[in-house]
């Protein structure tokens, strides 16, 4: 079990690193969206490539941060019932959901998206829009994002089984302290203090 927990912690570190880098793409998406709107309104000009880059980045945020979101226990769930249960009952529900819903769904998405990406890459497919971008980078995000989610699902499964076996702490409890938004604000403050 200790070996699996070490693997789980490495997966956690990977998704934490990816999440901390990728959530800065939100700022880039906002700036690009604002820039596109300003250029379109002031200069009556538009670029399909810039519009497509906007959805590439937006897709990257959601797909690449799916594992990080699972790590932080921030995915949408129905807490009305589960929140009233004991920690062990919650862990059992998570184990069941991971084994019978999350992992099969992720496996199907990886299985379907990998050939979709490969075909696009091998055929050098580009967008049908005039001035559009190549499609394979956006399509590569799908299997990578679901692979990160699968890895994190495995990590969460290991941590919950360890908790149920009495060999690890409650993995849900550690995420109740700070929301992701609070941590982002704290990180921005630390960066600002470091520059002054």
Range-by-range predicted roles:
Residues 1-196:
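Alpha-helical transmembrane segments and membrane-interface helix-loop junctions
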